[in-house]
């Protein structure tokens, strides 16, 4: 994502975007990251062989199977499923559960790979008390941003961040804000890329992305 790379580079970091898609013509390396994570977990050759503990991975992991709205889909009570038969709903449950299982295994294997290789990893995902990783993951998030519009984003939606092999800094650097009208978020393909707001990203990075041993 060009905005993310630009903001990282403005702080002196070299940044590359890896993604399975290139829908905005901004991806540096188009690759199936899920397959690469699986290969790295199985200790096979993968892109993780070229990533060291001096690098940092920022993972904007697909969230649509983890967030609380998915419960309505599992129960068949969301508007789009109200006219479905019980059989259709149950078949859909099987599909959702397979996708949830894939997402959960992949994000967990990503964390394990980074722990093994001592690679700093920061994972971003929506926050709620019913978020699947909040309830069923061994590693708790370390930062919860309850109102992203305060950092110039379009969305207020609470967001959480996991820090693995690194620690967050909590210092605040105040800059003038660029206020944006709030927008609603709809469901997307489970593996699709997010669109980023550069103002929020810059403020989140400037707030202090991580420290190692007390130093950045």
Predicted feature residues:
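Conserved active-site and SAM-binding loop architecture
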Residues: 1-215
